[in-house]
Amino acid sequence: MLLCVSANHKKTSFTVLEQLARVSPDFASELVEAEDIDGAAILSTCNRFEVYIDAIQKGDQDDVCKTGLLVQNRIGELCNISPSTIIEQTSFLAGCEVSRHLFSVATGLESMIIGETEIAGQVKRALTYAQKCRTTSPELERLFQRASAVNRHIRQSTKINEVGQSLVSLSLDLASSRIGDWSGVRAIIVGTGKYASKALALLKERGVVDISVYSPSGHVNNICNTEGVRNIFNLQTALSGCDLVVGCSSVDKPVITKQDIETAQASGSRTSRVRPVGRPSTDLTAIEASNRSRHVLIDLGLPRNFDPAISDLPTADLIDLDMLRVHAPFDNLAAEKMAHELAIESSSQFVNDCKQHEATPVIVSFRNYLESLTQTSLRRTDNCKHAQHALKHFVNSLIHIPLTRCKQLAANGESHKFAESMEILFDVKTDCTEGTQYQSSCGKSFD
């Protein structure tokens, strides 16, 4: 049975999300060592932490809830979060509700900014990492692969792409009220990943030409080799000569503290291109004279890249995920509604496909049984081509109605009835168990 423990910006505080971001990706490997779990994959973003599980269904609904509770408690232990807090601030989904949720997530319908596109790549990478660590299962792979396909279908069929902008884009929009002329801004990007690349592209679109990149881990990749971009190795020194810092790195602790900013501003010698919020743009000359050094810091990291105490400084403006959640724009309701309907429809189709997939052992056993009868009969007729063709045509005609009925039963979660009939009538045994993983928990979420 597919299960999901979800912590996200809708229900979980960013303080808890920050703690969850420190959970090692190897947690999935720990989960699959349990005898009742076949597979696990972790989706972790700046405003979401979700664990997807393929669990062996042994009992009733209470056993399903017990598995979810055990996973929630273990997550709490890893992050030093109390059981009551982790249960209160996470959701537990089971059965068909899992596919409906992931399809909505992959399409950006559950994002802080409706329709944003970064999440689709993050869903793909979550599956890739699980495959690399050998923690996935066939059922989980089908789920994640279908989620990517549904994302493409919904974006092609609706105007959801026109609704969503990225967190990076929104953060730069908010920063615009503090910046007079983007072309003169001196920017530093902390990090070298996907968000850093997005930040680099958007800064260039706005006319920023003075861009540096700092990697806390010392990792060098394509963004560090981009034309016109400088690599810096001493962040403290670079801070004194910059206006804007964008944090997009995965770090365990802040790379810039309040004291770092105070030191940088005390030693800064260049006029800042940043103005205090509320000052009219016509007053730039006075601002430059009175604010020799001022910073805007955009923190997109989880855990935080920058010390939240920086916001206490009168000469620094900190834009973080809490602020972005408040300023996230209203969505296009028509496009969102249509996208949600398609996600629900796709989830129903996925569940139906999975139910029919569960009937595969029954169908294969029945086909093998009839094939053996066919071969036995052919040996008695000198195996001539005419007889072979006629007999196979007869078998295919004979099997059509039973297999159609089997698929209908499977769609209702009753493929075991066909399996039982096969065993009674023909002594054909299969591994098909009673019911399906989607029957008892369909439509259930446990908050």
Swiss-Prot record:
Q: Which GO terms describe its biological process?
A: protoporphyrinogen IX biosynthetic process from glutamate
Pathway, according to UniProt? Porphyrin-containing compound metabolism; protoporphyrin-IX biosynthesis; 5-aminolevulinate from L-glutamyl-tRNA(Glu): step 1/2
Can you state which reaction this protein catalyses? (S)-4-amino-5-oxopentanoate + tRNA(Glu) + NADP(+) = L-glutamyl-tRNA(Glu) + NADPH + H(+)
User: What start-end ranges are recorded for coiled-coil regions in this protein?
Assistant: none
Q: Identify the residue position(s) of the site Important for activity.
A: H101
The positions annotated for binding substrate are T45, C46, N47, R48, S111, E116, T117, E118, Q122
What does the record give under GO molecular function?
glutamyl-tRNA reductase activity; NADP binding
Top-level lineage group: Bacteria
Q: Which residues bind NADP(+)?
A: G191, T192, G193, K194, Y195, A196
The cross-references to Gene3D superfamilies, in alphabetical order and at most eight, read: Glutamyl-tRNA reductase, N-terminal domain, NAD(P)-binding Rossmann-like Domain
Q: Which UniProt keywords apply?
A: NADP, Oxidoreductase, Porphyrin biosynthesis
Active site per UniProt: C46
Q: What EC number(s) would the UniProt record show?
A: 1.2.1.70
Q: List the disulfide bonds.
A: none
Q: Per its UniProt record, what HAMAP family does this chain match? A: Glu_tRNA_reductase (MF_00087)
- According to its UniProt record, which protein family does this protein belong to? Belongs to the glutamyl-tRNA reductase family.
Q: What else is known?
A: During catalysis, the active site Cys acts as a nucleophile attacking the alpha-carbonyl group of tRNA-bound glutamate with the formation of a thioester intermediate between enzyme and glutamate, and the concomitant release of tRNA(Glu). The thioester intermediate is finally reduced by direct hydride transfer from NADPH, to form the product GSA.
For domains, the record's comment is: Possesses an unusual extended V-shaped dimeric structure with each monomer consisting of three distinct domains arranged along a curved 'spinal' alpha-helix. The N-terminal catalytic domain specifically recognizes the glutamate moiety of the substrate. The second domain is the NADPH-binding domain, and the third C-terminal domain is responsible for dimerization.
Q: What does this protein do?
A: Catalyzes the NADPH-dependent reduction of glutamyl-tRNA(Glu) to glutamate 1-semialdehyde (GSA).
* The protein's assembly and partners: Homodimer.
Listed name of the protein = Glutamyl-tRNA reductase
**Native species:** Tropheryma whipplei (strain Twist) (Whipple's bacillus)
Provide the organism lineage as a comma list: Bacteria, Bacillati, Actinomycetota, Actinomycetes, Micrococcales
- Gene name per UniProt: hemA
